[in-house]
């Protein structure tokens, strides 16, 4: 009986803070979030996709201060598969990215070389930013934030 009370006490101590934290979603819009764009090159087009992606990467770095991380990685199980991983400072940074002329030129050049291009958003992204990405015609899945935090890296 004492053992049962001990277990119940432990459960109460450890589940209450988790439940409280689980109710604290981040506000959509002003917080950092992740976008993953998955690309699959047509046979024989991977090198051209890499070259075009390298060129736009430099332009995004130079012109988008709200893009905190921008990496292009190869799928380890498929030499024609790639993924952009992007961390945005906030939803406004995504809106700037979507309106970047260099991004538009990249998408126009790379799209004919692909047989797949999808996007996934993870986090507290504003409804306007999600709608703007979907308006590009890119199949997009948004995984809305349920709980968590964004560390302040300014201090």
Predicted regions span which residues?
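N-terminal secretory signal peptides that target proteins for export/translocation
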Residues: 1-3
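Hydrophobic alpha-helical segments, especially transmembrane helices
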Residues: 5-6, 98
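Bacterial N-terminal signal peptides
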Residues: 7-17
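Short S/T/G/P-rich N-terminal loop/turn motif that feeds into the first structured element of a domain
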Residues: 21-82, 89-99, 113-155
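Amphipathic alpha-helical coiled-coil segments
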Residues: 105-110
């Amino acid at each position: 009986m004492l053992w049962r009370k001990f277990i119940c006490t432990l459960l109460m101590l450890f589940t209450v803070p988790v439940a409280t934290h689980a109710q604290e979603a981040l506000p959509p819009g002003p917080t950092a979030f992740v976008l993953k764009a998955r690309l699959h090159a047509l046979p024989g087009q991977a090198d051209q996709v890499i070259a075009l992606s390298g060129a736009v990467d430099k332009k995004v770095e130079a012109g988008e201060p709200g893009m905190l991380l921008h990496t292009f990685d190869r799928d380890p199980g498929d030499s024609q598969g790639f993924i952009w991983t992007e961390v945005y400072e906030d939803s406004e940074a995504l809106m700037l990215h979507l309106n970047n002329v260099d991004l538009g030129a990249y998408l126009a050049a790379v799209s004919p070389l692909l047989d797949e291009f999808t996007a996934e958003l993870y986090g507290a992204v504003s409804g306007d930013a999600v709608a703007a990405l979907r308006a590009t015609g890119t199949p997009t899945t948004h995984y809305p934030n349920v709980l968590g935090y964004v560390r302040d890296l300014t201090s």
